[in-house]
């Protein structure tokens, strides 16, 4: 069963910090260079390495489509990787990419463009789970104690301590049947619902979403310290590749 992959990459990267942005020449994390290549391209390569991925669609800001398309086609000239204009939010960007997919596509995986260390085995495990159940995400156990709070005008107060054994920290890929994800977006638009991930939108349809164990290495590069860790991970990957 072939999988279509959507990489939303239209974000502005406001959390990376001014110093890191000035050093990198851009505040947008997906375009920052990691060992000579944009983070986005490292992520694309991971999915392109899977024979189960039929197409990869990257959603970027409208003004970036031409130059990103040029960068992509230099490495992937066959049309398997495409670039489309995203929207003003992650949700709009994913929806724009979703509307461009072939109607006979069966499974759709949505993955953060700035998670370039997804493991191929985990990727295939979540593909398999979604093929069986219709909806699956990658997640890791919560290691910190999580508090539910109420925010007042002057104080933030603890309302409850959530049972850690019942919590997972959601990662990506998040993989769904094509028709199910389309319906989730249609319902969200109709209701004015804005989700922080695709799973939250599918959950609104009373659909059970399975969780496949993820990895602590599958980091989302968000802060300057994440870039330091990413350089380390990439050098480790290069060393393993040389040894093999």
Curated annotation (Swiss-Prot):
Pathway: Isoprenoid biosynthesis; isopentenyl diphosphate biosynthesis via DXP pathway; isopentenyl diphosphate from 1-deoxy-D-xylulose 5-phosphate: step 2/6. GO terms for biological process: isopentenyl diphosphate biosynthetic process, methylerythritol 4-phosphate pathway. Coiled coil: none annotated. The keyword Nucleotidyltransferase applies. It is an enzyme of class 2 (transferase). It catalyses: 2-C-methyl-D-erythritol 4-phosphate + CTP + H(+) = 4-CDP-2-C-methyl-D-erythritol + diphosphate. InterPro entries: IspD (IPR001228), IspD/TarI (IPR034683), IspD/TarI_cytidylyltransf_bact (IPR050088), Nucleotide-diphossugar_trans (IPR029044). The record marks 164, 220 as: Positions MEP for the nucleophilic attack. Its EC number is 2.7.7.60. GO terms for molecular function: 2-C-methyl-D-erythritol 4-phosphate cytidylyltransferase activity. Pfam families: IspD. The keyword 4Fe-4S does not apply. SUPFAM superfamilies: Nucleotide-diphospho-sugar transferases (SSF53448). The record marks 15, 29 as: Transition state stabilizer. Keywords: Isoprene biosynthesis, Nucleotidyltransferase, Transferase. Catalyzes the formation of 4-diphosphocytidyl-2-C-methyl-D-erythritol from CTP and 2-C-methyl-D-erythritol 4-phosphate (MEP). Belongs to the IspD/TarI cytidylyltransferase family. IspD subfamily. This is 2-C-methyl-D-erythritol 4-phosphate cytidylyltransferase. It comes from Solibacter usitatus (strain Ellin6076). The gene is ispD.
